[in-house]
Each structure stands twice: as C-alpha cells, then as structure tokens.
Amino acid sequence: MSIQKIHAREILDSRGEPTVEVDLHTAKGHFRAAVPSGASTGIHEALEPRDGDKKRFLGKGVLKAVEHINKTIGPALIEKKISVVEQEKIDKVMIEMDGTENKSKFGANAILGVSLAVCKAGAAEKGVPLYRHIADLAGNTELILPVPAFNVINGGSHAGNKLAMQEFMVLPVGAASFHDAMRVGAEVYHSLKGVIKAKYGKDATNVGGEGGFAPNILDNHEALELLKAAIAQAGYTDKVVIGMDVAASEFCRDGRYHLDFKSPPHTKRYITGEQLGEIYRGFIKDYPVVSIEDPFDQDDWEAWKRFVFHVDIQVVGDDLTVTNPKRIAHGAEQHACNCLLLKVNQIGSVTESIQACKLAQSHGWGVMVSHRSGETEDTFIADLVVGLCTGQIKTGAPCRSERLAKYNQLMRIEEALGDKAKFAGRKFRNPKAK
C-alpha cells in the first residue's frame, strides 16, 4: 500500500528546542514519527539544518526542514506510489533527491522523520509488530531484548556541574530478563540518590538532561565511587557493571585534553591522550568498568588504536564513527574501537542505520543503540534494538518520560514475546553467540 498523505510540523523536544514530527497516512491508518537531536554532536554527522532566524527559538527553528517535507519530499513519494513495505526503495528516493553526502539539502531531520514514519507504516501494512518488521528488513530471524545502560550520573555537555566526563552508566547484566533489569536499574538509581544526598545534600540530587543526577563534583573517580557505593547498597555488586561515555571531543583542545574544561582555560591542566588512557586503565582496574564510549577526540585515531590494543573492555565509537559506513570501515581497518554506537539521526534514514549496524557486526564489533539528549516521546529505537538484536541500548536514566517511553516499550515487547523473549544479559557484546 502506498502513501496517501504526508504532513510535517515543528514540535519541541525534551530540551524545549524545535524538532521535526511527521504524520504519514496510508489506507491502513495514520503513523507518526518524531526526530531526536544531539547536544554533544560529532563533526562528521549528517547535517541537521536549523533555520538560523535569531528571532525564532534563538535560530534553532526547523521550519525549512518541515517545508522540504510538505512541499518536496511528500508530494514526490505520493506520486511514485511505492509500497511502504519497500523501506530501502523509499529511503533511496529521498537520498537521491537530496543529492548530497551529508543530507545538507533537505537535512537529516527531514529525511529521517519520513523514513521512521514509513517504517511504522510498513509494519502495519504487513500486520506485524514494528520490531518484527525491522528484523525482517535486517534479515534477522531472532529477536533479542537488550541490556539497558542507564545514564545515572550526568556530566559534560549534559549537565551544569564541573564533571568533564559526560555519562556514568549502570548495566544490569546479571538480570534474568529485561523487566528484571529495569527493576534492578531503578533500585540502583534510588540507592544512588540516597548516597548522593547523604554526602552532598539534597540539592545535589538535581537531575541532568537525561535524567541522571548531576552533583557538582569535579573528580571523575568520585562519580565512580558513588556508583560503586550505590550498587553495593542496593545489593547488586554481582549483577551490575559500569559503563561510561566520556565524550572526549568536548574537552579536547589542540590535541590535548582538559578535564576541567568548564572552568577558565589553563594550559597547565591539559593532558595528552596517553595520560588520559592511563586514567582509563586505572578506572578499569579499580571499578567494574566494562564499556567506555568516545574515550578520545573524534580524530585522535592513534590514541584510540593504542587504547584498544591495551584493554579488553568494550570501546564504543560515537563521535568517532557517527553511524557512517565510511567512518566505520576506517575504524575497523585501524582497529580503533570494537563497538558502534548507533544513532539513527547521525546517518539520517532507517535503511542506512540497518546497513551501518550490519557493517559493524561484520567486523566483529558490538552495537549499542542510542537515544539523543534532545528526545521526544517517540519509541522507535526500542523496536529497533530488538529487531537488530544488538543486545544493548542506552536511553537515559529511569527518570523523565521521554527516556522511560523507550524502556516501557521494551517491557511491552518482552511481555508480547512471552516465553520466546530472549534477554542479552552477560552476552550483551555479542548476543547472538551460542
């Protein structure tokens, strides 16, 4: 069944900033998708153009992207009468109409909004759940529930504290199911609130943009100590491990790293990539850290390679790879990381997201599906992670509705699958392994 009508509008994301929402109509019904947006963005991401009119939303409006959908993309797709189950064909039409490598003509936010809505319509057309449709598009027969990586302490560009490193996460790998993982994660989160309140006072339990706590601490070791104490207090030392998203590109200055970058610049505080790697190795030795994302700048390839060679944990590329096949291929060739962070809006279409995932997996990498800091109530990535069988997802703390929307959808999916539900657990890095 082909598309009958497409209408896009400007809505607000979880940060109060404009983003694109798309309504798509077929004979089967009405399908809606909303596009997320990042705060710490990689310079190599597909372009998400803003209007630039300082009198509207401080220049961050997306009316041009909305207009591209309503006046160009929508009419072209309706005219072509392509069935909504043909995801790749529809995405290809939009990409070719845009004609640029980084989607700068229409914008990744315009193309992705339509692509997500098409995928939802395709599932309805086939009469299957969205996660099953995505699995079919990816050629997967299995369906796997992921380990959630809860971002429970926020720093970096996600919080107004002095903490340089952006996310400190807990992963309930020892849980028996996704429902159990949610319970464990929520209990650790509440335990952490108590630990922070007892040590720093009630105002230290304010939350950041992704629902994690944002105590005004500077030392990254201190954040890890808080997590270690909260996990122990909740009684889950044997079930919960720690992940980090350093987002080091945010504090890299001329090839060196400034761990107090929110204070006035002071070159004596800058350290080299090698010194930063030593700090990470200390974290791995002293704490149950099993995953570190973006430990170095997005173009500091030598530091990445050196670090991956010396550690056996998961090293995740986000700003390094930006869900882009060329960057993934180069990263694999350089042995620069061993896991892709998959963000649909970095590449700008469902088809290219699936291709990026499969490319990373073909190199033996893990894949972690991710939200963005500017989120909406859209739950697409919950179905995506199950259909792609990546085994891991990060979509914030168990706090703030735009984060819980995804986690709650995953619980519904697990319930719907019943005894066929498979939870990645300790195999989260390679969930298909027998």
UniProtKB/Swiss-Prot annotation:
EC number in record: 4.2.1.11
GO molecular function: magnesium ion binding; phosphopyruvate hydratase activity
Required cofactor(s): Mg(2+)
Listed SMART domains: Enolase_C (SM01192), Enolase_N (SM01193)
Tagged with keyword Lyase: yes
Keyword annotations from UniProtKB, A to Z: Acetylation, Cytoplasm, Glycolysis, Lyase, Magnesium, Metal-binding
Family matches, as Pfam families: Enolase_C, Enolase_N
Function in brief: Glycolytic enzyme that catalyzes the conversion of 2-phosphoglycerate to phosphoenolpyruvate.
Family membership: Belongs to the enolase family.
Protein known as: Beta-enolase
Organism encoding this protein: Gallus gallus
Gene: ENO3
